[in-house]
Regions:
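Rossmann-like NAD(P) dinucleotide-binding subdomain of oxidoreductase/dehydrogenase enzymes
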Residues: 143-295, 439
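Residue-level signal for inorganic ion chemistry
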Residues: 48, 86, 108, 198, ...
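Glycine-rich loop-to-alpha-helix module at the N-terminal edge of alpha/beta enzyme cores
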Residues: 51-143, 147
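Conserved C-terminal structural/oligomerization subdomain of aldehyde/semialdehyde dehydrogenase
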Residues: 47-53, 249, 402-405, 409-538
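ALDH superfamily catalytic-core signature
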Residues: 259-419, 482, 533-534
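Short, well-ordered beta-strand elements within core beta-sheets of diverse protein domains
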Residues: 50-57, 74-78, 175-176, 285-288, ...
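Structural signal for hydrophobic packing residues in well-ordered secondary-structure cores
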Residues: 73, 77, 94-101, 105, ...
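Hydrophobic face of amphipathic alpha-helices that form TPR/SEL1-like repeat modules
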Residues: 1-47, 72
Length: 538
C-alpha cells in the first residue's frame, strides 16, 4: 500500500480499497470469496453515498473458519509455542499498523466519519497497544509453572504434601466481535491478547464500519501467523450469531450494546462458554462549584463530543452543582454553537479555531449511519414531546450544504432539568446529546451518578482532592477520573485494566487482567518426584 495524505478524496480512498484484503474473507490463512458470493454496502457518513462493498459472510463461512481453527488447535503447535514467540508475531502486526496509519486513517475517516487526524492519532494508539500485548508474552511465560504457596502455616493451614504449580492455558477457539466506533482499535484489542495467549481466533467486525479490521488478515498473513489460527469473517448480525452459537467456540469477546451483550450471554449459556463483554454506558460528569469554570466547559465538551458522542465511555450525563449550573450551561451553549461541522472528514477542511482548546473535539463529525441518525433524532423527538427542555441543538444543523449533502449530521444537544426516570437519563443514545441534572451536596452527587443501570466510566471535577477522592470512591463504575483540570479524561493506558459495572459489561480489558481473560488457570500437583525432576526429564 502507498501512503495517503490528508488532501486525498473519497475517490482516492477507494483506490486503496481495491486491495484483496478489503474484498475477501480471510480464512485458513487465505483470502477467499464468501461461499454465497454476497456483498454489503458501506456508506460515507458525510454524504450518505456508498463508497465500497464488503464481502458478506454467513454461517457457512463461519463454519469454514471454525474448521480451519479446529485443525490449527488440534495440531497444538501454536498453543505450545512460547508466548513470547507468539508475542513477537503480534509485535510485527502492530508495526504493520504503524507503517500504514495514513492509509488506515483515511479508510476509517470514510467508513466511520471521524476526522482524519483523530483517526490517525487513535490508530497510533492501537499500534502502541499491540506492542504492549506482545511484551506480555514474556510475562505469561514467566507465570507458567509458578509455585503455589499452599499454606505452610499461613492461617493455621498445614502445607500440602505435594508440590503445586499454576499454569495459564489458552482457552481454545475464541470468537471476537468488534464495534464500529473505533473499528481497528477495538478489534486489535481483542485479537492481540487472544493470540498472545495461544488461542485460535475468529474476528467478526461490525457490519456498520469494519473495513480497517480486514487489514488485520493481511498483517497476519504477512507476519506468518499459522493457517487457521486467525480468521476474519465480515457479515451481518446473523453471521455473528452463528459464531456465538457454535459449540466449538469456547469463548466470545464482544464490544457493543448492552442489549446485544445480553443476547450473547443467553446464547452462550447452554454450552457454558465464557464471555467477555464491554457494553454500553451513560457516564456521569460530576462538577463541583469549586472547579474552574473554563476547564469544566472544556472537559464537558470533550467528554460528551469525542467521536461525535459515539463512544461507550462518553460522559453524556452532566451532574453540576447548583451554584454554577446556569453559568456553565451558558458557556457550554456559546461554545457548542460555534463549533464547525466536519463536512469532509477525509480532507478536514474545517478545523475550528481551537480557541477553547478541547483536544480532538474542535469539529462536529457526522454520526456513522442513516439508522443511527434516525435513531438519535427519534430520541430527541420523544424527549421534546415528553416536555424535556432542549437548551440548545435538538435536530439537524440548519446549513444548506449539510442538508444538501445527505450526510448524517446532528446538532450537539443539551437537555436540561431531565427527570431521573426518563429515557434521556437512563438510555444510551450514542450521539452528541448531553442530559443535565443538578445537585447541592456530595451525597446528592453520588446518588445522581449511580442512578442508572450502567457503570462504565465517570469523572469527578473538584479543586478539593479529598472531596474528589471521596466521591470517586463511591461511584459505581469501572473507570473513574478524579481531576481538578479535566486532563486525562477518557484516556486509556494499555497496562491499566478496565471494564464495566452492572449493565456495562462482564470481564476486563487491557493490562495483565485483559490477557488473563483469554486463558484458563490450571493447577498441577506433583507428588513422588519434584517439579525440578519433571522439568529436567521433559
Amino acid at each position: 500500500m502507498t501512503k495517503i495524505s490528508k488532501t486525498n478524496s473519497i475517490g482516492q480512498v477507494q483506490k486503496h480499497l481495491t486491495a484483496e484484503c478489503f474484498n475477501k474473507l480471510f480464512i485458513g490463512g487465505q483470502f477467499v470469496d464468501p461461499i454465497d458470493g454476497q456483498k454489503m454496502p458501506t456508506h460515507y457518513p458525510a454524504t450518505g453515498e456508498v463508497f465500497h462493498e464488503l464481502p458478506k459472510g454467513n454461517a457457512n463461512d463461519i463454519g469454514s473458519a471454525i474448521r480451519a481453527a479446529k485443525t490449527a488447535w488440534a495440531d497444538g503447535a501454536w498453543a505450545n509455542m512460547p508466548a513470547s514467540a507468539r508475542g513477537d508475531l503480534v509485535a510485527r502486526m502492530a508495526k504493520g499498523i504503524e507503517e500504514n496509519i495514513e492509509v488506515l486513517a483515511a479508510i476509517e475517516a470514510a467508513d466511520v466519519g471521524k476526522p482524519f487526524r483523530q483517526a490517525a492519532m487513535v490508530l497510533g494508539g492501537a499500534a502502541s497497544e499491540g506492542k504492549y500485548w506482545a511484551s506480555l508474552g514474556a510475562v505469561l511465560d514467566a507465570e507458567q509453572d509458578k509455585p503455589v504457596n499452599s499454606g505452610g502455616g499461613m492461617g493455621g493451614l498445614p502445607p500440602t504434601e505435594w508440590d503445586v504449580v499454576y499454569r495459564r492455558d489458552p482457552i481454545g477457539i475464541v470468537g471476537l466481535i468488534s464495534a464500529w466506533n473505533y473499528p481497528l482499535n477495538v478489534a486489535f484489542r481483542k485479537v492481540a491478547p487472544a493470540l498472545v495467549a495461544g488461542n485460535c481466533a475468529i474476528l467478526k467486525p461490525s457490519e456498520i464500519a469494519g473495513l480497517s479490521c480486514m487489514f488485520l488478515g493481511k498483517l497476519a498473513q504477512d507476519v506468518g501467523i499459522p493457517e487457521g489460527v486467525f480468521s476474519v469473517v465480515t457479515g451481518d448480525r446473523e453471521t455473528g450469531a452463528a459464531l456465538v452459537a457454535s459449540p466449538s467456540v469456547s469463548m466470545v469477546s464482544f464490544t457493543g450494546s448492552s442489549l446485544t451483550g445480553s443476547k450473547i450471554m443467553e446464547a452462550s449459556a447452554p454450552k457454558l462458554s465464557q464471555v467477555a463483554l464491554e457494553l454500553g454506558g451513560k457516564s456521569a460528569m460530576v462538577i463541583f462549584e469549586d472547579t474552574d469554570i473554563e476547564r469544566a466547559v472544556e472537559a464537558t465538551i470533550k467528554g460528551c463530543l469525542t467521536n461525535g458522542g459515539q463512544i461507550c465511555t462518553a460522559h453524556t450525563r452532566l451532574i453540576v452543582q447548583e451554584g454554577i449550573k446556569d453559568d456553565l450551561l451558558k458557556k457550554l451553549k456559546n461554545v457548542l454553537e460555534k463549533i464547525p461541522y466536519c463536512r469532509d472528514p477525509i480532507t478536514e477542511k474545517e478545523r475550528g479555531d481551537r480557541a477553547w482548546e478541547t483536544g480532538v473535539t474542535d469539529v462536529i463529525q457526522p454520526v456513522v449511519s442513516a439508522s443511527q441518525h434516525e435513531k438519535i433524532l427519534g430520541f430527541l423527538n420523544e424527549f421534546e414531546a415528553a416536555g424535556i427542555e432542549i437548551y440548545t441543538g435538538g435536530g439537524v444543523p440548519d446549513l444548506a450544504d449539510v442538508k444538501k449533502s445527505g450526510g448524517y449530521f446532528i446538532q450537539p444537544t443539551i437537555l436540561t432539568n431531565v427527570p431521573r426516570n426518563s429515557d434521556a437519563w437512563q438510555k444510551e443514545i450514542f450521539g452528541p446529546v448531553l442530559s443535565v441534572r443538578s445537585f447541592s451536596s456530595e451525597a446528592e452527587a453520588i446518588t445522581e451518578a449511580n442512578s442508572t443501570a450502567f457503570g462504565l466510566a465517570s469523572t469527578v471535577m473538584s479543586s478539593d482532592p479529598a472531596k474528589a477522592m471521596r466521591v470517586a470512591n463511591r461511584i459505581r463504575a469501572g473507570a473513574v477520573f478524579a481531576t481538578s483540570t479535566g486532563e486525562g479524561l477518557l484516556a486509556e493506558h494499555p497496562a491499566v485494566s478496565r471494564g464495566g459495572f452492572g449493565c456495562s459489561g462482564v470481564g476486563r480489558e487491557l493490562g495483565i487482567g485483559g490477557l488473563h481473560e483469554y486463558t484458563e488457570l490450571k493447577s498441577v500437583n506433583y507428588s513422588g518426584f519434584s517439579i525440578a525432576e519433571a522439568k529436567e526429564k521433559a
